[in-house]
């Protein structure tokens, strides 16, 4: 009985940890070999992130993004490699007459995308999904600057270990609707590296105070880097 109980505990604990990481034998170079489901991390043609060398475009005409963001409740979920903020809302963005509904936010340190080789200290990914399961992601660079009051609500959640704790976040106060962005078709930046993600990488970084950035890195990311290296880009498609 004791042996059965011990095995059950081991299986339960192992299920709480991911089989991939950002270091060593389970790091990004090996993701594609860890599982059949992860094969696109190795053989995918449109993988993310990338080093962006092409021009930014205006938010308009063929690449117009319409935002429908309002104050929405968000809940955190601590993961082994990251922290996920999940939204309980019907907020969405519209691109080419299709609505993509707000799903979740992740942070990466340092930034995963580069712009002509330049990397920022932090990058925020806002994921959306359409009714037919297509993904659209906003990538927003973060740099050290003025305190951003809206992010204090997320940081307070990181400090709150109470199960089911929520905060109300207004992304309309974070996302700069008038900003230029870089657009390309890519993938999720973590296993299984599924492709078909429409990436909108905002050109202008937003600001957070050094203290805010450090809290996100230390509390949310456990002080560890979690950026996938840039992938080969196929510019002939654009």
Where are these regions (language model features)?
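Sec-dependent N-terminal signal peptides
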Residues: 4-13
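Positively charged n-region of N-terminal signal peptides that target proteins for export
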Residues: 1-4, 117
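Alpha-carbonic anhydrase
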Residues: 16-238
């Amino acid at each position: 009985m004791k042996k059965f109980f011990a095995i059950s505990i081991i299986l339960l604990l192992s299920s709480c940890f991911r089989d991939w990481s950002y270091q060593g034998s389970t790091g990004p170079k090996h993701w594609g070999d860890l599982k059949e489901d992860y094969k696109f991390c190795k053989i995918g043609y449109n993988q993310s992130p990338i080093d962006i060398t092409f021009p930014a475009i205006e938010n308009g005409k063929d690449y117009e993004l319409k935002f429908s963001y309002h104050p929405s409740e968000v809940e955190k979920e601590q993961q082994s490699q990251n922290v996920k903020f999940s939204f309980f809302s019907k907020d969405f963005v519209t691109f080419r007459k299709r609505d993509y509904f707000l799903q979740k936010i992740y942070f990466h340190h340092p930034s995963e995308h580069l712009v002509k080789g330049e990397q920022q200290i932090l990058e925020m990914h806002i994921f959306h999904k359409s009714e037919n399961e297509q993904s659209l992601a906003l990538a927003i660079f973060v740099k050290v600057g003025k305190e951003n009051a809206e992010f204090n609500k997320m940081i307070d959640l990181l400090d709150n270990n109470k199960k089911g704790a929520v905060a109300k976040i207004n992304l309309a106060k974070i996302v700069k609707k008038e900003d230029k962005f870089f657009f390309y078709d890519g993938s999720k930046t973590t296993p299984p590296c599924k492709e078909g993600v429409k990436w909108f990488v905002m050109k202008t970084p937003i600001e957070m105070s050094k203290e805010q950035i450090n809290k996100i890195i230390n509390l949310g990311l456990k002080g560890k880097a979690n950026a996938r290296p840039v992938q080969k880009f196929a510019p002939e498609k654009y």
